[in-house]
């Protein structure tokens, strides 16, 4: 495939995803799915850690989840950094401060680092890659953004974790390059699928461009299919609940599990504005309907899982 054909295919996939996203009724569910999916992909692509989604959901509740390893506890930090990335810089925020915040968020689990030295290294890292980042922010064409991602990836900035930082910034940069402001599309999963080929392509600017466009197309297509799946899963979960067991808070509770498939009783009560007793009544109905399953914890704050919400 030629570079022109690859770029056209990427634009087409992004346009289809953008159009579907505009009509997707629950953008917060889509955003939550993307953040979880991209976190798992970044953990695999940059950290070499094949993390289960259930473990990630537990870590999002408790970042010291007892059944997790030290390396897995990086996942909530990656998750927060991705959310910071797709939100973009605030209107009055210096983009370089925004980039530093993303990097700092991703390193939050490193509790033993020298904070002062780390801050100096972050500033030095940003200055080292200042030119390609400024180019990508001021002239966000697909070609310029692709080269920016490549230079961050192969550079020695960010304590040698340029690959991670490139993947964290990619969703926002892709969004601007392909002029799809509502789209959430990353690169990590597509690039991790054939790591050897990716490592070969990233060292050469021309080879990388074609590889980058193909990864964008694959990622946009996967996100499109995932949103379709999420819509079906939501309808299927609602259908499991008989009308006589349905309440005005059943729907919001199901949506809560679609945003994070593992929830605690206190999370549910707080999110739907209910008392602990009222939340337990809804939880019992969802358990009887087969929507959720109890996990661990005390009766007062037990965890519950909706396995179907992980289907996408």
What are these regions (language model features)?
Residues 1-312:
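FIC/Doc superfamily catalytic core
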């Amino acid at each position: 495939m030629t570079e022109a054909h690859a770029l056209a295919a990427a634009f087409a996939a992004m346009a289809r995803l953008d159009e579907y996203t505009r009509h997707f009724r629950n953008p917060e569910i889509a955003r939550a799915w993307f953040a979880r999916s991209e976190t798992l992909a970044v953990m695999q692509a940059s950290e070499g850690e094949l993390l289960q989604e259930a473990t990630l959901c537990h870590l999002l509740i408790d970042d010291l989840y007892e059944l997790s390893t030290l390396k897995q506890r990086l996942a909530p930090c990656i998750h927060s950094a991705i959310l910071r990335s797709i939100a973009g810089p605030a209107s009055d925020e210096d983009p370089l401060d925004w980039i530093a915040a993303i990097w700092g968020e991703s390193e939050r689990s490193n509790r033993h680092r020298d904070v002062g030295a780390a801050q100096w290294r972050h500033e030095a890292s940003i200055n080292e890659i200042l030119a390609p980042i400024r180019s990508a922010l001021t002239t966000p064409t697909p070609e310029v953004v692709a080269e920016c991602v490549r230079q961050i990836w192969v550079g020695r900035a960010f304590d040698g974790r340029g690959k991670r930082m490139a993947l964290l910034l990619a969703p926002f940069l892709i969004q601007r390059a392909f002029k799809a402001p509502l789209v959430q599309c990353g690169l990590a999963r597509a690039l991790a699928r054939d790591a050897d080929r990716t490592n070969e392509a990233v060292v050469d600017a021309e080879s990388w461009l074609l590889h980058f466009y193909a990864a964008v197309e694959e990622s946009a297509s996967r996100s499109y299919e995932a949103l379709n799946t999420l819509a079906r899963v939501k309808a299927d979960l609602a259908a499991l609940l008989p009308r006589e067991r349905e309440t005005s808070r059943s729907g919001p509770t199901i949506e809560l599990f679609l945003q994070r498939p593992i929830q605690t009783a206190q999370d549910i009560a707080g999110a739907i504005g209910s008392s602990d007793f009222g939340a337990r009544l809804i939880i019992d109905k969802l358990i009887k309907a087969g929507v959720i399953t109890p996990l661990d914890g005390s009766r007062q704050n037990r965890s519950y899982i909706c396995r179907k919400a992980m289907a996408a």
